[in-house]
């Protein structure tokens, strides 16, 4: 098995997100366990010749998990590009990498890259579902690299490494409310806004475990700003106007979510800032708003690895049966 997870040492971020690990490990079952809903989060690459089979296997996995007690939702999202405004690059670089990864895929220079969110009502339900070994056994065989050769394609002996971890949602929001309680977050995860025409972002960072309490406070405050602000500020609909390359307008985030690794990795802790926006431009312009920048200051100051914030499009999603 060539599974990689969150729980080793030597953490890093790749250009596409969390760095796969060199060693395999089962999901932890002891220590302080998470309470409330959890997400088994995975990032993995698929060679183009393997993509159809991999997608079929994920559909079958979703259909199986949908019948498991405690299952809430599954979303598969394909990476298409990267945010530049999260890096504080000059505004002239806004949106320049929005579809760069997708262009690399089309040019035959990159594999498919996916993020998979598997949501359960609680940690025991996730463990009992077998989602972790099921991914390894059912999707893992389709993750081999494939190289062209004169005599025909060559398939790697081992699957390409993938990343996985269990995350807790510590806060979420939509255009109606900011959610911190278990019932509200459970409903949010069961009924996400995952339409394919929307833009997903997932900002990957690590902080020092000792800073977790303050970071949680600051990152939830940032979520509130991202969820409630818009431009122009006098927009009659209280949502904002569509962002574009040549303006600084943006509509409120469609939804926002802060996911925290349920387990520390040595002295570090991983977070995902997961948002859904009407467009890339809405997201990028939100980073130019002084209100967002002020709220982001304390969050950025605590980050020791990151940020890496890819853009994704939802490939498919499935709820409980």
Q: Locations of the language-model features?
A:
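Hydrophobic h-region of N-terminal signal peptides that target proteins for export
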Residues: 12-20
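Short S/T/G/P-rich N-terminal loop/turn motif that feeds into the first structured element of a domain
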Residues: 7-10, 25-137, 145-298, 304-321
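Short, low-complexity disordered leader/linker segments with a strong preference
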Residues: 1, 19-26
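N-terminal secretory signal peptides and thylakoid transit peptides that target proteins
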Residues: 1-13
